[in-house]
Curated annotation (Swiss-Prot):
Lineage, top ranks: Bacteria, Pseudomonadati, Pseudomonadota, Gammaproteobacteria, Enterobacterales
InterPro entries: UDG_fam1 (IPR002043), Ura-DNA_Glyclase_AS (IPR018085), Uracil-DNA_glycosylase-like (IPR005122), Uracil-DNA_glycosylase-like_sf (IPR036895)
Entry coiled-coil feature ranges: none
Name of this protein: Uracil-DNA glycosylase
GO process terms (BP): base-excision repair, AP site formation via deaminated base removal
Similarity remark: Belongs to the uracil-DNA glycosylase (UDG) superfamily. UNG family.
Organism: Buchnera aphidicola subsp. Cinara cedri (strain Cc)
Function: Excises uracil residues from the DNA which can arise as a result of misincorporation of dUMP residues by DNA polymerase or due to deamination of cytosine.
One Pfam family recorded for the sequence: UDG
GO cellular component, one term: cytoplasm
PANTHER family cross-referenced by the UniProt entry: URACIL-DNA GLYCOSYLASE
Alphabetized Gene3D superfamilies for the sequence: Uracil-DNA glycosylase-like domain (3.40.470.10)
Any one GO molecular function term: uracil DNA N-glycosylase activity
Localization terms from the record: Cytoplasm
Chemical reaction(s) catalysed: Hydrolyzes single-stranded DNA or mismatched double-stranded DNA and polynucleotides, releasing free uracil
Length: 227
């Protein structure tokens, strides 16, 4: 078995940066930025990897592509910086979270950095987007990259809880070794689908049960979320 403490994201990037698709992807995004506003900012694109070291991953929450309005995307799926208005999907995530733990408090902000620092890897399937155009960077190569990320986590880590919300995320299940990890699925927290399975899925509570059963420290989902 591989020693997770001797393997890091650096090892992963050293592998991927040699691949033709990745070189093409980075060059393509660079060219798009010359004529178009792209989110998140260049220095935030890989924030998920900076906030959550490979060896600390307990949970993976897989999103789709970044928010496409100004000031929202900052490299963590579903998250927005402090002070930014909560997008609808994030509002619904917090509704479900509060219902999981019968907890309520006003003035909650949308920055999920505290989750990331506790081992919740907040990954989008596509890591960039052009301003105002959702899914505009689909099929540029990000899907190949993030599929490799998921495979790498599945191979190197053990006992990770994968939260797959929505059809796009659920299609990634085949990348995960279900014999050594846990997969929880539901509809997307978007207003279009939240009542079709996301509300009431109890994923936050179930995740902590699965972590505790492995003698891992549960996630404090409310840590540093209040303004």
């Amino acid at each position: 078995m591989k020693n997770i403490y001797k393997i890091s994201w650096l090892d992963f990037f050293l592998i991927e940066k040699k691949k033709e698709y990745f070189l093409y992807l980075l060059n393509k995004i660079k060219n798009i930025r010359r004529n178009t506003i792209v989110y998140p900012k260049k220095n935030m694109v890989f924030n998920a990897f900076l906030f959550t070291p490979l060896s600390s991953i307990k949970v993976v929450i897989l999103g789709q592509d970044p928010y496409h309005s100004a000031g929202q995307a900052h490299g963590l799926s579903f998250s927005v910086p402090k002070g930014v208005f909560l997008p609808p999907s994030l509002k619904n995530i917090f509704i479900e979270l509060k219902n999981n733990f019968s907890f309520y408090k006003k003035n909650i902000h949308g920055c999920l950095e505290s989750w990331a620092k506790q081992g919740v890897f907040l990954l989008n399937s596509i890591l960039t987007v052009s301003k105002g155009i959702p899914n505009s960077h689909k099929n540029l190569g990000w899907e190949i990259f993030t599929d490799q990320v998921i495979k790498f986590i599945s191979d190197i880590c053990k006992g990770v809880v994968f939260l797959l919300w929505g059809n796009i995320s659920q299609k990634k299940y085949y990348l995960i070794d279900s014999k050594k990890h846990f997969i929880l699925r539901s509809t997307h927290p978007s207003p279009l689908s939240c009542y079709k399975g996301f509300f009431g899925c109890n994923h936050f509570f179930k995740t902590n049960v699965l972590l505790q059963n492995q003698k891992k420290k549960p996630i404090n989902w409310f840590l540093d979320l209040f303004e």
